[in-house]
Amino acid sequence: MKPIVCAIDAERIDEVWPLVEPHITIGVEAARGELTVYGVHQALVDGDMLLLMVYQEKKVIAALGLDITVHMSGKRTIGVTVCAGSQLDEWMVDIIEALDQLGAEMKCDAVVIIGRPGWTKKLAEHGYSRAYVAMSKEI
């Protein structure tokens, strides 16, 4: 059975939260202290982030938190702030299509995905290129 991607309205976050929280938690753990599970939940409930949920055969297999950024230039981007799941190869194309569609609906100019290096090769096959490199040092 093909995975299904659906956007969850802010009003329904608490209803689906027990199903997506394990995935969000994994994504937060990979965020190097920049996110918290509570903060992601609150942003979703407040409508400051959008939740995409991927499910297959009545089981959630991935969750993504998206946000819109309006840059100083006026450029609008839709970005993946947090993402985790299993069976990536089965749903990645569907997520890319959903990001393109949502971005267009929200009048965005680009999709921005910040992730680990392994994403670069997978996303290049779908028209993405490395925009910049971020480096970090704990102090």
Annotated model-derived regions:
Residues M1-L35:
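Short amphipathic alpha-helix that is part of the acyltransferase structural core
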Residues D48-M49, E125-S129:
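Short glycine-aromatic motifs
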Residues E29-M49:
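Active-site rim helix/loop that mediates acceptor-substrate recognition in acyltransferases
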Residues D48-D89:
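Conserved donor-binding loop and adjoining core beta-sheet/short helix segment
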Residues I114, S129-I139:
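Conserved catalytic-core motifs of GNAT/GCN5-like acyltransferases
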Residues A43-V45, E57, H71, A104, ...:
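Sterically constrained small-residue positions within well-ordered secondary structures
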Residues K75-A124:
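Acyl-donor binding region in acyl/amide transferases
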